[in-house]
Amino acid sequence: MAGLSDLELRRELQALGFQPGPITDTTRDVYRNKLRRLRGEARLRDEERLREEARPRGEERLREEARLREDAPLRARPAAASPRAEPWLSQPASGSAYATPGAYGDIRPSAASWVGSRGLAYPARPAQLRRRASVRGSSEEDEDARTPDRATQGPGLAARRWWAASPAPARLPSSLLGPDPRPGLRATRAGPAGAARARPEVGRRLERWLSRLLLWASLGLLLVFLGILWVKMGKPSAPQEAEDNMKLLPVDCERKTDEFCQAKQKAALLELLHELYNFLAIQAGNFECGNPENLKSKCIPVMEAQEYIANVTSSSSAKFEAALTWILSSNKDVGIWLKGEDQSELVTTVDKVVCLESAHPRMGVGCRLSRALLTAVTNVLIFFWCLAFLWGLLILLKYRWRKLEEEEQAMYEMVKKIIDVVQDHYVDWEQDMERYPYVGILHVRDSLIPPQSRRRMKRVWDRAVEFLASNESRIQTESHRVAGEDMLVWRWTKPSSFSDSER
């Protein structure tokens, strides 16, 4: 391939369907590699075509074998239904292909004792033969159906004439004749039918596995949904745990030390905290479940909570403040939050407490279920919206990439057209068909792009001009005064055949 001239190289490429450009020292190796690759592809296509032509002949042979296998039982069935005696049990004819001496020597003595018509008993019939004949089933019928084809392929014309003149004899069971001498023939003939029967089985198996997969996926989604509901509803025993913690809290008894007073103070404090906890939990639950009382917040003002406790327990403000002081000094979670004006700051004294809020709102089952369902649906919608946004962004990026590729391809096509126009103009100038050896850039643009497409192709044209200015050495950009105005033109530079030193 290295010895090919430029003309031969161009002809080889054109014969393989590739239109090369100008062949120079810089592009000759590229075109040689291109020719080598095109020859390899042509060789692969020829091999594929030969394989495609050989495949129909194999399919026709398989169909012919299947047709012969279907016709064989029709020819063998009348002989099998004959009411006469079994021919293969009697002495075979002298001209028969089965009359070979000693062929069935091991079964001929026993066969003579049970030869007879179909209406007679067969006392001498071997029990082993009866068991084998009963086990064979449909496989024996298939083997009998191919007997005429084997007989017609026997040696000699006399065997074929005997077969055509005599009734079709019943063949010996395959269990007595030994293993099948052609085990591959049955598998070959049964291959297309078995494959045809296996296709629906594969489809049903695939459908069954898909249904199981969908079932398990549905069960998994159901379990995930129930888990989200359980987490959002929260543990119902949380308020009871808070009440148990309050009942176990110690009581401040600094002023009085007698046992009776301490017991009374403890009971009064626990009762006050219990009522305060229930009140705050109910108010917070009402605010979360529709807010029927039009509350501004779940955090209840201190004065409102103090009035409620005074009405229910008849406790003084001093006991209420003592309860708040104990909550601030306790390290246990009693389910009550004390908040100040700035709810982000931690309250340390009773004077800074502005409102009280329950840590465990008391809501009904329906409210908890609806809130959990709303939260789950919201999260699912947010997930799908994010997924749709990402999918749309991916589609937009793919569209952008495709447009950039199309624009780049259009730019390369425009570069080829510009090179052809400038080169043709130079050739015409050499033949005295043009006045100047250069051509204006705008003139080339107007000749290549129609007016209705110039705005759309402006970006492609600008990229093509930049590409020629930076990557094409055969075209030089010059400035000439044409009709009294400076104009950018392109001049084709013909490669010189001699260097300056040789001149």
Swiss-Prot record:
Name of protein: LEM domain-containing protein 2
Species of the source: Homo sapiens
Subunit structure, as described in the record: Interacts (via N-terminus) with LMNA isoform C (via C-terminus) (in vitro). Interacts (via LEM domain) with BANF1. Interacts (via C-terminus) with CHMP7. Interacts (via N-terminus) with tubulin; the interaction causes microtubule bundling and stabilization (in vitro).
Gene: LEMD2
Biased composition (Basic and acidic residues): 42-74
BP-aspect Gene Ontology terms: heart formation; negative regulation of MAPK cascade; negative regulation of phosphatidylinositol 3-kinase/protein kinase B signal transduction; neurogenesis; nuclear envelope organization; nuclear membrane organization; protein localization to chromatin; skeletal muscle cell differentiation
Region named Winged-Helix (WH): 395-503
UniProt entry keywords in alphabetical sequence: Acetylation, Cataract, Cytoplasm, Cytoskeleton, Disease variant, Membrane, Nucleus, Phosphoprotein, Transmembrane, Transmembrane helix
Main location: nucleus
Location within or outside the cell: Nucleus inner membrane; Nucleus envelope; Cytoplasm, Cytoskeleton, Spindle
Sequence segments annotated as region (Required for nuclear retention and interaction with LMNA isoform C): 74-130
